[in-house]
């Protein structure tokens, strides 16, 4: 497991490749029979390059999510994020609430994650999401930052029109890792 670099994606690489060398992907509830529909795009929004998630989240057929997902290591392995305090995102959206989901190598089932909500306003805003405030969802596992594997920007849990963009996502803090 290698130590996590500060920058996850600053939108400088050729789309849909992130700064960490992996590719953003769109995941929807259709993988489990839902009917939500969405699109991922790379575009310039209010003067900034961004990756954007747009679509209709539907609760039909036990669905209810659209997600921009990104593995944190190109080999699918985990990174060690213990030296960081949390995640910082530059976000833009339609004044709706979204989630950032974390997955670790301890998580096996697709519905398990660690979650933190944020609001995406119609102006570029920087949000700080401290790891200490992420809550486990349908898992008994602790959030082990030395096993961080994947992040997801998620529109979830209610029927609505999703429109959220990320211009920068990185770790913040930078203390020393625990022994």
Residue ranges and their predicted role:
Residues 1-179:
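Beta-rich carbohydrate-recognition modules and glycan-binding surfaces
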